[in-house]
């Protein structure tokens, strides 16, 4: 499964494209904070 934030998972585990993920993690953290968890990873 590809979570669209630089993280993709298989049956063996998950891996992260850190260059892509850090931008999204930062954006999602801010948006999750502002919306009480209704944005970013939880949409």
UniProtKB/Swiss-Prot annotation:
Keywords associated with the record: Antibiotic, Antimicrobial, Bacteriocin, Disulfide bond, Secreted
An individual GO BP term: killing of cells of another organism
Domain of life where this protein originates: Bacteria
Entry GO CC: extracellular region
InterPro entries: Bacteriocin_IIa, Bacteriocin_IIa_CS, Bacteriocin_IIa_dom_sf
Gene3D superfamilies: 1.20.5.130
Location relative to the cell: Secreted
Disulfide bridge partners, by residue number: 9-14
UniProt keyword Disulfide bond present: yes
Family according to the record: Belongs to the bacteriocin class IIA/YGNGV family.
Stated name of the protein: Bacteriocin leucocin-C
Organism annotation: Leuconostoc mesenteroides
Species lineage: Bacteria, Bacillati, Bacillota, Bacilli, Lactobacillales
């Amino acid at each position: 499964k590809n979570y669209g934030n630089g993280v993709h998972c298989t049956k063996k585990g998950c891996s992260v494209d850190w260059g892509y993920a850090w931008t999204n993690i930062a954006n999602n953290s801010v948006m999750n904070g502002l919306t009480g968890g209704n944005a970013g990873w939880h949409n």
